[in-house]
Curated annotation (Swiss-Prot):
Annotated Pfam families: Polyoma_coat
Chief place where the protein resides: virion
Note: The virus attaches to the surface of cells by recognition of oligosaccharides terminating in alpha(2,3)-linked sialic acid.
Coiled-coil ranges from the UniProt annotation: none
Domain notes: The intrinsically disordered C-terminal arm interacts with neighboring pentamers. The unstructured nature of this region allows to make different interactions depending on the structural context: pentamers present at the 12 icosahedral fivefold axes bind five pentamers, whereas pentamers present at the 60 icosahedral six-fold axes interact with six pentamers.
The name this protein goes by in its record: Major capsid protein VP1
Lineage: Viruses, Monodnaviria, Shotokuvirae, Cossaviricota, Papovaviricetes
Originating organism: Murine polyomavirus (strain Kilham)
Subunit structure: Homomultimer; disulfide-linked. The virus capsid is composed of 72 icosahedral units, each one composed of five disulfide-linked copies of VP1. Interacts with minor capsid proteins VP2 and VP3.
Free-text function comment from the UniProt entry: Forms an icosahedral capsid with a T=7 symmetry and a 40 nm diameter. The capsid is composed of 72 pentamers linked to each other by disulfide bonds and associated with VP2 or VP3 proteins. Interacts with terminal alpha(2,3)-linked sialic acids on the cell surface to provide virion attachment to target cell. This attachment induces virion internalization predominantly through caveolin-mediated endocytosis. Once attached, the virion is internalized by caveolin-mediated endocytosis and traffics to the endoplasmic reticulum.
Subcellular location: Virion; Host nucleus
Gene3D superfamilies per record: Capsid protein VP1,Polyomavirus
InterPro entries found in the cross-reference section: Capsid_VP1_Polyomavir, dsDNA_vir_gr_I_capsid, Polyomavir_VP1_sf
Amino acid sequence: MAPTVKKRTSQNQGLSPQKSQNSVVVGGIQVLDVRTGPDSITQIEAFLNPRMGKPVDSDFYGFSDNITVSADYTQDMPRIKELPCYSMAKISLPMLNEDMTCDTILMWEAISCKTEVVGVSSLTNCHSAVKRLYDNEGAGFPVQGLNFHFFSVGGEALDLQWLWKNYRCNYPAGVAALQAAPKAAQVLDPKLKAKLTADGKFPIEAWSPDPAKNENTRYFGTYTGGLQTPPVLQITNTTTTILLNENGVGPLCKGDGLYLASADIVGFRTQQNNKMHLRGLPRYFSIHLRKGCANPYPVSSLLNTFSSEMMPLNSWMLQVEEVRIYDGVERLPGDPDMIRYRIIWPGRLLSLIFPAMRHKHLYFFVMQAFIVL
């Protein structure tokens, strides 16, 4: 007997094309296309050494100075050499654009990253002038205690938020710190922000990555507390971190610059005199980038600038830094260069839909439509 043929159900008939979110606003740069070809992909390798406090010419380079503890909240004055700071670097990428007046430009887009803490095996050292388990006997204490691991890859400097345990702490000169911080510094104060623009200047204990910003940066971090916590670190060259967001776009390198940052504290080293200092390790990066065709100055950004100048937000307590707006779902367009502009004006809403602006007179057309409103 011949096998029966299963009939198609109505659920499998006439499948409609998949729909995606209608992206109205997503960052300040509009990606129009991804370039392909033998020279469209490049790889950058770099490493960042830890900035634990001790200078490069010190015998304890890679360590902080001996940790001091204040006896009173109002007398908290850490020394500069006992303050681990973020490591950062700006890597100049090959120049892609000779003419910056075009309506579209090429930009490097970071798509994936391989990174690893280097020197994990050095933590097995238990004999280099450290405190021993028993009096004059036994192995020395290995590096142990709190662990903080962080790295970031971005097309611009990492955005930071100041948040500190003791607002009355007096930081030394030479580090990026507030000398007269308000009480709100012990929680999230939207006014206390900065960008990581200097290597070894931003104390890790006071600055954190800003989750409300960093639209063009990907960051990752873990923390494990304690004084005797054993460090647990993985060694492998097979793990790849994808840097693309939910829209398939990675960090776009503005000005042909790639920004890297890291901080890797693996614990305390306890000396024979019971004094302790922190140990840091370097981090290796391998970044893959591809070329992307982008419009960094779309008309929607210009119109948004005009609107914000006429109707500014006048309250710093509004804890909104960046906004992404989605309006329902739509069919994926056959023309990937189709651009939608939606101009919101008090009491009115105007939608403009036309192909990619390949001629500059279209800028004038949209500006006229805005003026008519």
